[in-house]
């Protein structure tokens, strides 16, 4: 289980991602006080008859329609009901947890004005892992997804925990709770702001981080199998590009490939390799740059109050500020950018797969088949990778530019931030499959090398780990199942950490390659140092926990 999270100051993207994967969290006393204070401001606005958007007016193009005090509860409930218009497949457990965590973070700023009871019910949903049904489609920016979460609070909709599914009203009765009656402003606040795109992009950052680490490892395996020229990763040459991430990837690759007899035997054989091998540091390093920028934007978003309006001032002199802080332009653009970066990493991986299966350049049996001709080996797996690259190319078109006009010209500029985050997650899905295919192809290529020269110690660790789970392929079983198994390896958070190999007994314990893939330790940042060679005393097939 991930580290316990106390929501006091704004969460980081890493904390949101940890909560998404199951980490428990609670509101600090200070956060509770801020929420209560903001609620008193809303009550003061209502009592004083101050006109405030969504508090005592309609919403969207109906913003100038004043709502009578007796109808404010009705207004809040109606907002939730009318905004719960999502369609399509349901979001997964982690995605919904990430959205709710970001929403609670937004309320904890103490600028929205919802009651503490509402926020605590959201926290309780996650504590008991009851996941509201939230359809994936239907948002041009925000609103829809959180409206479906809010349905659960008022006794509508359904929730799920594992394989158990219940009507929200039944769950509330089982917990001896009454459906929440939404008060003034709560209907708007609970659907408003950028928690949806922020939560989804935080989760995407965690997945992208893990995938970038794996991309370095898997590309090193392909590089070794294809007898690449290590001079391409020479530190002096890479340092001429002023990019710390480029140099870091180069250092990781050198360390991963240190001690390779395969590469030692092929040194100087070619002047230079193809770009899918030679430019790994440049492409992976650039993708890491974009990742770092996106992660920073998510943290900025979590530190911002993204409700509209926000409430400030004092109980004697309250203010409701109607602006556009709920617009997710910054994070939508960042999600688009990270999607492009991860699509490029995956596209380069597909080119290496093609080189591994092509006997004209690999020096290996055609399509990595154990019996070429009678067996097709990885021929069609490369087709799958090419198909996923093509889909990613379509998905990488920026959602932020889609535009559109809604709500009677009142909302005449749309950022499509949530769609940007959703397609980023889909790009990551495809990239995981592509890199899984490359991992399998690289392991197969090691088996088929013409000479018995030794692999680098670090690539040997990964090869053995793969073979502990997935045997050599001989066309005797559906290859799709192997791809799924490889993807489970890639999704393990600890599986690529060589940094603490050979650590002393007082150091971090080793994790088992055979651990359940959905066990989620606290998320870790990209490695600032390259992997080190494994000590001879360490057992093969294991890696250390993240530091």
Annotate each PLM feature.
Residues 53-75, 82-105, 133-154, 163-164, ...:
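FAD-binding core of FAD-dependent oxidoreductases
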Residues 1-49, 76-134, 236-239:
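Glycine-rich, flexible loop motifs
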Residues 104-108, 124-132, 140, 155-158, ...:
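Alpha-helix capping at helix-to-loop junctions
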